Amino acid sequence: MTPHREYIAPAQLDWQGAQPVSTQFDDIYFSADGEQEVQRIFLQPSRVVERASATERPWFTIAELGFGSGLNFSVSADEIVGKTDKILHFISIEANPLTPKDWRKVAALRPHSVTAQALAESPLPLLTGWHRRSMHQGRVQLSVFHGDVEDGLGDLADFQQQPVDAWFLDGF
């Protein structure tokens, strides 16, 4: 576990219209059809809603590397809350988190998303270590590790007592 928290450098974004682009990695955070892309690339192939509905446990856990703008999280939360009676625990690791200003811009692009609005209202701090949020009256639990992926995965391996039901691995 991270013994103390330190400041972590935020993502450096260049907003090209409604599209955030990482100046560090010269890569977009999401495409114009980002929500449909999450459905197509992550949710449908991994049958998240079907598998969450079928599990006997009261929760379903998704983990990913790279929280970015939280789009995968937001779309997953909307699907789980809207189509099942399960609690979603979403775990992510992020090396360069968004600034509060960027969270507000993301939320403005997704006014219909409860999770995007919640992250804009209470952004994750620019500090290393684990940060947690509860949303949708406790039906969505978010755990994000800010820092090096090896440190985050090490902590996860040491302390995550429940299985991860689905992993979202991006090609970044």
PLM region descriptions:
Residues 59, 163-164:
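Local beta-strand N-terminus motif with an aromatic residue
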Residues 69-74:
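Glycine-rich SAM-binding Motif I of class I
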Residues 165-172:
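A short SAM/SAH-binding and catalytic strip from SAM-dependent methyltransferases
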Residues 97-98, 149-151, 172:
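Short acidic/polar capping segments at secondary-structure boundaries
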Residues 104-159:
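S-adenosyl-L-methionine
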Residues 1-63, 77-114, 118, 138-140:
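Rossmann-like AdoMet
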